[in-house]
Amino acid sequence: MKLLRRWWGVIPAALLVTIVWPERAFVPIWDGSVYMQCVVDAATTGLNVHSLRCGGHQSQLYMGLLALTQLAHPGNLTAIVAMNLALALGALAAFNAFLRKLLPGETWWAERALIVTIIAVHPLLAATLVQLNSDFGVYVFFAMSLAALAWRRYRLAAVAGLMLCFSKETGALIYFAALGLHLLFRALEAQGSVMDRVKPVVRSAFPALLPLIAFAAFLAWWSATQGSYAVWNQGIHERPVEGMHWFDFDDVIFRSYAAIIFILGFAWVPASALLADFAIGALRSVRRMGSRALSGVDAPLAAYLTALTATLAYLLTVYRTWSFPRYFVVLAPLLLLAAFISAVRLGAGPRARRLILVAMVGLMCTANFCSWDPVSRAVFGTISLGERRAYDVSSIAHDFRVTDADHLCYNLQFTGFHWAQNAMYAAMKPTSRTTIVFPRFNRWGLWAPLDATTFVRVARAAQTVMPDYRDEAMVAAMRDTMPRELWLVEQPNDGDTLAVQKLHHDYADADSARYTAHGLTLTARHLVRRNAEVLPSGAHR
């Protein structure tokens, strides 16, 4: 038993690596393509505050770590995945440290081990790790900041907090909330007047305040010297503050956010425990029955955890944009931790707790590769990917012209878009003169160079071929110089793009082929110019 306890930490790490490592050649798509290109370009042209502002976010420190992996060989995706895995393992260690504070003693070792395992195999973690984005940096450095604050290691909190603030603007907001609540709870525990409580707390925790001071100073410098907004806006709103909806709880985007946080991918399981605990607590409060004991649990830290979870659930839904699950990746472990405390408060014994946690490990492992949660299917509906189905995450808000894009990045099924395209390109063997058309509203982040030998999608520039990628509007604008033939790529998430109808004005169907990989199927339609001589097979190459 002692040996098992000593080496259990290897199991979550091994499971995460086993889940993620097979996707190390995945070339990020959609928004992930923007971040990938930013990192590669920064490594090529030079690392600075501008080149590392990826996707319009103040992400310099996290993206800087990824860019370091590209200095020797730009476009090395394996190095990026390896760096993200190393950071993820650091986050798991941080959550374990937090749990040792929350659930101290050897009597809780099995629960701590199982909770860390659930966090490690959570499908949203794997999806956010593989699909390059700044939210993964927020997740990692939030975990480290949380553990440092719980143990009152304020210098470590300062380092982790600085990385968190410069991973994404929401990272600074999250750190502000985590640190602010921490200081508040410490002050409430102290004795004396307000000033007598606040002064020693602020004095001892002052190093942890430095990241917020540095971030505020940086934003002030940016606003004074640069021509763009200091925080991400991306043209959605005339001013970033206009995206804030502090008290609008009847907004369709808010409803979509709430469903993602509390339902998507078995999130309703921990959410149900929280809801039951809240209902019973409210009833007991009305009846003035007193508080329920949390035997063996650090009660003040448990209260802090609950308050932080509720605060972040609110703050992360205030700014309304798109229904991308990665925006809420930090809430996944918090929801699990808070739900476990609720289960303890509800009276679940050790055997019941451990059985539930073991079941959750199984659910999360399988949820990485398929979308079989019946509640999520009922709430979101599904779309067919070919051999499998995925949750239609955009169905509530309908915030995209296509059916789903980064909405699908809640588990690893979305990587099938990359692998199915690889199968198509390997069969086509395109050259730079081969015209490949993606629908105008479903080409974002999908055009990539191909390896000159294997024709698989890659991120590097050397020894590659770049097909003549276009959309239907670009083809129509060519007029007399339209290619004799082209291939239209139809994907499961196209929606109503009308690309085929528009191309049929000038092109007729010749044939088509379907390509399937990782359960996802796409179709390549071969179209030829009307009244134009058709080249012999292979002559286009």
Please state what every model-predicted region is.
Residues 12, 110-113, 159, 208-212, ...:
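Signature aromatic-anchored transmembrane alpha helix within multi-pass, membrane-resident enzymes
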Residues 20-30, 44-67, 71-78, 238:
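Membrane-proximal lumenal/periplasmic loop motifs of glycosylation machinery
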Residues 29-30, 127-135, 324:
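Short acidic/glycine- and proline-prone juxtamembrane loop motifs at membrane-interface regions
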Residues 41, 181, 185-188, 200-277, ...:
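Membrane-lumen/periplasm interface segments of specific transmembrane helices
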Residues 56, 60-64, 72-93, 113, ...:
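Loop-to-helix entry region of an early transmembrane alpha helix in multi-pass inner-membrane enzymes
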Residues 94, 137-156, 160, 185, ...:
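Specific aromatic-rich, kink-prone transmembrane helix
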Residues 137, 141, 167, 173-174, ...:
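Hydrophobic/aromatic-rich transmembrane helices and adjacent perimembrane loops
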Residues 149, 360-444, 536:
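Membrane-embedded, lumen/periplasm-facing catalytic core of multi-pass transferases
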